[in-house]
């Protein structure tokens, strides 16, 4: 028995399909690099392929906290033992994997799709299995539609996309064969370019914790982690006085990348106190395995509640599988190459004593289970047997992704090159590639209204070369061409060249968007006064645009011009002043210029300041709370000592040791 079904699924969500208007290049364009204390035998590609932003992808930051019911397209694969539910409009996320025999959910299934700021594009949501390809961090498509197609005869559900930062295509073919107790996930990445490119893949699996004595088992006795960005190896299972294979033992948020044994099958299992849980097995290419624990602090608890519907979905951890040994790196992928692998996900049910005793006994128990559940070398054999099927075109397209794959094929056609991944159907959708098509076919971007936000960007070398040619010809006096080049240079770290193009654009037209990016260029050069001036100018040109005004306030906050920030926010319309981010910056400014009581009032107004897109690792609310107490203590001559444990729960987002 097997079936594939598509239907609408109603889920609570704060989903917003409107993207941000201002491109993001990271805070300072200077990301933190990893050092290491590893032996020369480790051979990690540390820092290779790391990025500071998701540019040219737009930010997905226009959501609030209010949840409403919304219907999402879902695809369900089902057989006698398992039921798998996917969401193609949200990166192809595996939303649920249900064990029919035990009548239990194998994943952490979030009752709400609640966007929060944990990804390079901002929006991310917890739960299920996420398929992360391209750049380090969460997939650029994790909260976006991807291409999805079905083949009911073969019982295959396929997701795929063109990832334009790396210039690669990826696809995952999902199947649930009749009689199988494992969901089959067959992945394929193709580098169709003539260049070596950094490639990143991690399958991110959320599993429930919260008092269930969950233990994570993998074929390892060492793990990679980092202390203050210095990568080290630590023993498994005992490290620093705790058994790190139990996620709930960790006092703080932490990543452990299991150093898998070369002689063992590549698996990971998350098994609770009753001996029940989820097991994953892969073919040989997918060597990396990871455990992420949120830790046990107040801030960690708050984050898990923040990601759910009022915290009523409980706690979770993540077990992950990747191409590289760690997420501190990408792997160099040769030109014109395909990488393929298979993952299998299913239920595991063992005697609890075998799992919750010696770690070597737990490993043996899982490995014996896999030997019994699957034929020898099953994953490798399945990979070979489905090689032709993976290149079969699927014509029943049920969800469309971006237009960039179709645009790349058009670009290739004009120079006589073959299309990318010819068995994958890429179409044109309404996501703003017309500018680039015009550049390709006519040698010009054409005219653009400087008061309307540009819809799309790129950093691909071929397009940048075309834009550079355009400003020497038809687009010499076209602000938009200079602006696009300025953005591309800034993303590439060519800050001087970026500033030159952006200054040219700023002289040609009055555009708040040019001024916003120019402010970021100045900030990255350390020219704080110029950055602040351009930020204020951007808001003056778009006084009714909340995003532009919020951006201006952010730049003034980053440059620490607190009096200017205070004056700026207090000149905004009352409705604009209520924006959570603007209110936060205004409160900081008030405290820094000696108005601590005013800052405290802004912080506590209406039950306390709530920032919908509070960023992972951001502690601005706690910092503001501390500063208010320090300023008050100064006025009375008292000494104030910071203690993270004192921060009220609603303002607590730190994931470090509380002291």
Go through each PLM region and give its residues.
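Acidic, contiguous internal or C-terminal segments within carbohydrate-active enzymes
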Residues: 78, 84-102, 159-210, 218-222, ...
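Alpha-solenoid helical repeat scaffolds
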Residues: 480-484, 513-517, 547-551, 580-586, ...
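A contiguous, surface-exposed recognition patch within enzymatic or periplasmic domains that forms
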Residues: 2-44, 75, 89, 96, ...
């Amino acid at each position: 028995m097997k079936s594939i079904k598509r239907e609408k699924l109603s889920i609570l969500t704060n989903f917003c399909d409107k993207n941000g208007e201002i491109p993001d290049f990271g805070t300072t364009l200077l990301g933190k690099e990893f050092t290491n204390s590893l032996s020369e035998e480790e051979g990690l590609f540390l820092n290779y392929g790391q990025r500071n932003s998701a540019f040219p992808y737009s930010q997905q930051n226009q959501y609030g906290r209010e949840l409403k019911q919304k219907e999402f397209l879902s695809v369900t694969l089902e057989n006698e033992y398992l039921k798998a539910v996917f969401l193609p409009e949200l990166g192809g996320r595996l939303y649920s994997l249900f064990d029919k025999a035990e009548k239990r959910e194998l994943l952490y299934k979030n009752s709400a799709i609640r966007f929060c700021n944990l990804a390079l594009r901002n929006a991310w949501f917890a739960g299920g299995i996420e398929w992360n390809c391209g750049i380090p961090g969460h997939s650029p498509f994790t909260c976006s539609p991807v291409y999805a197609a079905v083949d009911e005869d073969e019982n295959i559900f396929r997701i795929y996309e063109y990832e334009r930062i790396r210039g690669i295509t990826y696809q995952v073919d999902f199947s649930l064969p009749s009689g199988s107790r494992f969901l089959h996930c067959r992945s394929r990445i193709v580098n169709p370019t003539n260049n070596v490119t950094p490639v990143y893949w991690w399958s991110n699996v959320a599993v429930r914790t919260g008092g269930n004595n969950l233990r994570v088992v993998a074929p390892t006795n060492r793990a990679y982690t980092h202390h203050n960005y210095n990568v080290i190896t630590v023993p498994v299972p005992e490290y620093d006085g705790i058994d790190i294979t139990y996620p709930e033992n960790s006092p703080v948020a932490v990543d452990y990348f299991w150093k898998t044994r070369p002689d063992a099958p590549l698996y990971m299992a998350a098994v609770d106190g009753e001996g029940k849980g989820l097991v994953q097995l892969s073919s040989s290419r997918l060597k990396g395995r990871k455990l992420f624990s949120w830790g046990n602090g107040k801030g960690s608890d708050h984050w898990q509640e923040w990601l759910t519907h009022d915290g009523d979905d409980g706690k979770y951890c993540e077990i992950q599988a990747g191409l590289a040994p760690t997420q501190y790196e990408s792997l160099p992928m040769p030109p014109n190459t395909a990488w393929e692998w298979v993952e299998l996900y299913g239920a595991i049910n063992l005697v609890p004593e075998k799992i919750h005793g010696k770690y070597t006994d737990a490993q043996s128990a899982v490995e014996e289970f896999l030997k019994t559940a699957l034929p020898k070398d099953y994953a490798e054999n399945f990979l070979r047997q489905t090689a032709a099927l993976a290149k079969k075109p699927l014509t029943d397209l049920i969800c469309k992704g971006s237009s960039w794959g179709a645009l790349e094929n058009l670009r290739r056609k004009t120079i006589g090159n073959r299309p990318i991944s010819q068995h994958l159907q890429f179409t044109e959708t309404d996501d703003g590639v017309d500018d680039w098509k015009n550049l390709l076919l006519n040698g010009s971007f054409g005219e653009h209204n400087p008061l309307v936000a540009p819809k799309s960007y790129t950093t691909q070398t071929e397009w940048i070369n075309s834009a550079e040619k355009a400003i020497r010809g038809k687009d010499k006096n076209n602000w938009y061409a200079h602006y696009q080049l300025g953005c591309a240079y800034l993303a590439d770290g060519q800050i001087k060249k970026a500033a030159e193009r952006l200054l040219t654009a700023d002289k040609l037209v009055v555009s708040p968007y040019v001024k916003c990016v120019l402010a970021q260029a100045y900030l990255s050069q350390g020219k704080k006064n110029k950055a602040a001036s351009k930020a204020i100018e951007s808001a003056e040109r778009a006084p009714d645009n909340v995003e532009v005004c919020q951006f201006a306030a952010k730049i003034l906050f980053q440059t620490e011009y607190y009096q200017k920030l205070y004056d700026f926010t207090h000149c905004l319309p009352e409705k604009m002043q209520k924006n959570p981010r603007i209110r936060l910056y205004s409160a900081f400014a008030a405290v820094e210029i000696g108005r601590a009581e005013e800052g405290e009032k802004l912080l506590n107004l209406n039950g306390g300041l709530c920032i919908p897109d509070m960023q992972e690792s951001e502690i601005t609310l706690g910092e503001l709370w501390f500063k208010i107490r320090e300023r008050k203590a100064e006025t009375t001559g008292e000494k104030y000592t910071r203690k993270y444990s004192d921060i009220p729960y609603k303002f607590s987002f730190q994931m470090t040791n509380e002291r």
